Each structure stands twice: as C-alpha cells, then as structure tokens.
Swiss-Prot record:
EC number(s) stated in the UniProt entry for this protein: 5.3.1.9
Subcellular location as annotated: Cytoplasm
Gene behind this protein: pgi
Organism the protein comes from: Prochlorococcus marinus (strain MIT 9211)
Functional note: Catalyzes the reversible isomerization of glucose-6-phosphate to fructose-6-phosphate.
Taxon lineage: Bacteria, Bacillati, Cyanobacteriota, Cyanophyceae, Synechococcales
Disulfide cysteine pairs (residue numbers): none
Name of protein: Glucose-6-phosphate isomerase
Length: 532
C-alpha cells in the first residue's frame, strides 16, 4: 500500500487517498470516509499490532469477560441484538423472551387489546428516565416516528420543577389515556424517582389509578422492580446489570418506544447486529469502526486533544450529537488508565445539524482555533419534494454539506464523513452500533476502561452530601432563631461555608426562610425560619 498523506490542496493525491481509505457496505448502504483525517501510512503500520490487541479485547468482552472491573460485571449490549452470542443459554433466553414480550405488549397497546382502566385506547406516553434512559428513546422518537403513527411521546428527563409542571399540565386532559414508563436501572436513582413521584401525585389526585397505566424498565429485584410487582403495574421489563445506560438502546429501553410508535424494531436490531459483524473484522482497513478509532487517535494525538463536532445533515438526526455526547464522553472521559496512571483522557463532543450550523459556529470552525475535527453525516435518499423555481431542497442540502467539507479542508481542518443511502430503523441501528464499537476500540488503544463511570458516581455522592447538609441546616433553623452563615458552619463543624450560602439562598427564594443583610456580602446575612 502506498497511501498519500492528507493533501487538501492536491486534488490528485487526495483522490488517490480517498480511494484507498473509503469503506462501503452494500447491504447496509453505508460509507465511511476518513480520507480528510490526518492519518498517514506510518501510523497505519505502527497501529496494526495495537489494534490486534484491541480486537482481542473486544472479542473477550463479547464472550463475557469481566469488562467492568469496578462493578464486577460483564458488558453485554452486543448480545441484545444477537442473543446467540451471549455466554449462557439463560442470558440468550432472557434476551429472546424479552424481545418477544415487547413485540406482544406494544402490538396489544396499539391494537387496543390492552386499554386503560377506563376502557380507552392509550394515546400518549410519558417517558421518565435520565441519561441513557432518556436520550436513547428521545433519539429514536425524534428520528423514526412517522406522522400520525403510534403513541405521542413526552419526556421527563430532569428534575426542573417548572419543566415537570409544564409536561404534566400538558397531559392533564389525557391522564386516562397516558401510559407512564419509568426507567431506572437500580431503581434508586433520585431524578427518575422524583419525577415519578410528581407524575404519580398528579395521576392520583385526579382520581386515576397509577399501577394500571404504568410500566417499569429496571433490574430484576431492584427497588423499582419490587414496587412495580407488589403494586401490580401494567408491565415490567428487565434492564440487566450487564447493560449500561449509555448502551441500552438495543434493549427494552429502545425497543419499547420503537414498538409504541409502530416502528420496525427487528430491522433496528438487524442493522446493529450486521454492523457488529462488520466491525469484528481484524483487517484494519476493512473495519469501519477501526478506521474511525484510528482517525480519532491520530487527530487528537492519542490524548483527545481535538473535539469532535457532529454535523448530521438531516433533521431526524438532530438529537444524535447529544446521544453521542453521553456515549463518547462518559465512556472515554477518564482520569486513570487501567494501570492506575493519571492520564486525563477524553474526547469532547458537540454539534447540532446542518445546514443550520453553517449559519452559527462553522465560521469559527473554518477561521478560528483549530482544535476539532468534524464528523459529517449525510443521507442520500430524499422524499419527493416538488422542484420549485428549478430548486430541490435535497440537492441544496447535499451541496451545503459538500461545500462546508471543502471549505474546512481548504483551511486544513480535518473531517470524516459517514454516508447513509437511506435513513430508516436498519441504518440507524447500524450507525449506533458503529459508534459503540468505535468507542470500544478507541478505549483499548488508549488503555482506559470505557465501561465504568467513577466521575458520575462521584457527582452523585457529592449531590447526596449537599442534600444531607441541607437537612442539617434546616434542623438548626427549626428553632426559629437568627443565624449567620458563620454560626451555622460552627454548629455543623463544617468549613463548607460556600455550599451553606448556596443552600440558604435557594431556601430563601423559595419562600421557606427569610434573610436580612446583603447577598453581595455573605457574612452580613442573617437567616431565620418564618412561622406560618
């Protein structure tokens, strides 16, 4: 092989490079082009032995090795789209049975065989889940739901009280025909628990029965699972401990919403499974995920020094950059490598959609700081929009994408391009699986664990500590006496005066306590609990 270096200003050499590096699969109708990433022949040769170790590690993971050492768990999202790969018959049966149950349940909901307790057809879904439990379903709904087909989805993915009130107020007249789906792997994550409690309160204060219109997706024997079974909820689906939230989209977390919008969940699984097969190829240039992982590695000097800007030129993929933010950044953003060395790894991801972004931050991408590479995503097949004034929308969209790609290259800005022949459940499943495998391979190249999230757990613990501190502060103020921040800090033997200030400010402006003094001068403030 004689691969020319990245030569944006030499069209002849760049064409040769493009032809050498282009990957295509006819069955999936998918192309991957890394020719405008700064990968050279020397790196190809140098990375081959490292990639062989990465391929072996991924093979071991798929066979059931303890990939998540921190939690002593296997990592099995690849089994979800091909149950025969699972390391035991019990797991294979569990996956196959769950797919069948989801198909039966969603078909019964849509046909009216399963109705509300008032005998009405379900019309809406309130999906309660955070992180991967919310982003994955949101991506599927925004990407694949057809007009006037299936149930209408609404999402509670935060504990913003105003946001919760707005969603519940919107559903006020539809409570009797709304299906409530609560997703929480452990069953104890505060955000979905709080959102569920708020939704349940509205349902029950309006005289409706919560269990008869509620579905849980959670681990077997979790707090939520036990509650749902004790109260005889409409249905529960299993979220196995070997599936992480950010890779749960081909399990019940993704298949249930697909079924409820009457989309082809089998094709979605097939697309992911087919891409899994293609990305098991140990030949570097014949494996699209390996090509992308190599491009990430080269572009960021193996340290994630360049951000990834995701530009999908299709409205249906507008949520995809947010989905990739979690998949990539939660997986790769690690302080330590596998040996415990401090490495501060990661890959920052942001984006929206083209051609909107051409009128936003593409100006900086072309002429500003060169600290990124772009991932373009295009779809070739368009609908039958009329040709008006000799103009077709799809032609212009494609032209804008190609023009942006060339304009960036002219300024020596790197990009890779993923092209889909059509956009449907099959191609979306393949696209998601492509990025999942790329993340896994890249993590092996930089020697980090992609399947744990100690930073997330640290954030949860810190939040719990703050909430506990608030309880202690409120206990002190319960005697209706005046207290300064310094006095409260002394009573609590706490040096965290800043957090005490933030907590008290929140309490005061939510009409629980009064404050005298200047907010600009925290030491002057005196707080008191008001008698009702």
């Amino acid at each position: 092989m004689n691969l020319p270096d990245y030569s944006p200003n030499n069209s002849s050499l760049q064409w040769e490079r493009f032809s050498e590096l282009l990957w295509h699969n006819e069955e999936l109708g998918l192309w991957v082009d890394i020719s405008r990433m700064n990968v050279n022949e020397h790196e190809l040769k140098e990375l081959k032995p490292i990639f062989q170790k990465a391929f072996e590690a991924m093979n071991s993971l798929e066979k059931g090795s303890m990939a998540n050492i921190d939690e002593e768990r296997m990592v099995g999202h690849y089994w979800l789209r091909n149950p025969d790969l699972a390391p035991s018959r019990d797991i294979s049966k569990l996956i196959a049975n769950q797919i069948s149950q989801i198909e039966q349940f969603t078909t019964s909901i849509l046909s009216g065989d399963i109705r509300s307790d008032a005998g009405e057809l379900f019309t809406d879904v309130l999906w309660i889940g955070i992180g991967g439990s919310g982003l994955g379903p949101l991506l599927l709904i925004e990407s694949l739901q057809e007009l006037n087909k299936g149930l209408k989805f609404h999402f509670l993915d935060n504990v913003d009280p105003i946001g919760i009130d707005k969603k519940l107020e919107l559903l006020q007249s539809k409570l009797s025909t709304t299906l409530f789906v609560v997703v929480s792997k452990s069953g104890g994550t505060p955000e979905p628990q709080i959102a569920m409690d708020q939704a349940r309160h509205v349902v029950e204060t309006n005289g409706k029965n919560w269990p008869t219109r509620s579905v849980a997706i959670t681990m077997c024997n979790s707090l939520l699972d036990n509650k749902a079974k004790q109260e005889n909820w409409l249905k529960t689906f299993d979220l196995p401990d070997w599936v992480g939230g950010r890779t749960s989209i081909t399990g019940a977390v993704g298949l249930l919403p697909l079924g409820l919008i009457d989309s082809d969940l089998k094709s979605f699984l097939l697309g992911a499974s087919k891409m899994d097969e293609l990305t098991r190829n140990n030949e570097l240039l014949d494996n699209p995920a390996a090509l992308m992982a190599m491009a990430w590695y080269s572009s960021g000097s193996a340290k994630g020094l360049k951000d990834m800007v995701v530009l999908p030129y299709r409205d249906s993929l507008e949520v995809f950059s947010r989905y990739l933010q979690q998949l990539v950044m939660e997986s790769l953003g690690k302080k330590n490598d596998r040996e415990g060395n401090i490495v501060f790894q990661g890959l920052s991801v942001y984006g929206n959609k083209g051609s909107t972004d051409q009128h936003a931050y593409v100006q900086q991408l072309r002429d500003g700081i060169n600290n990124f590479f772009v991932t373009f995503i295009e779809v070739l097949t368009n609908n039958e929009s009329p040709c008006l004034n000799n103009k077709l929308p799809g032609d212009y969209l494609s032209g804008f994408m190609q023009g942006t790609r060339l304009a960036l290259s002219d300024s020596n800005r790197q990009s890779l391009t993923i092209t889909l022949k059509t956009f449907d459940p099959l191609s979306l499943g393949a696209l998601i699986a492509l990025f999942e495998r790329t993340v896994g391979l890249y993590a092996e190249l930089i020697n980090i664990n992609a399947y744990h999230q100690p930073g997330v757990e640290a954030g949860k613990k810190a939040a719990a500590d703050i909430l506990n501190l608030q309880l202690q502060i409120e206990d002190i103020l319960s005697d209706y006496s005046n207290y300064s921040i310094e006095q409260i800090s002394t009573r609590l033997s706490s040096s965290n005066s800043e957090s005490i200030y933030f907590i008290l400010r929140n309490l005061v402006f939510n009409n629980k306590y009064s404050a005298k003094g200047s907010w600009k001068n925290p030491s002057s403030l005196i707080f008191k609990r008001e008698k009702l």
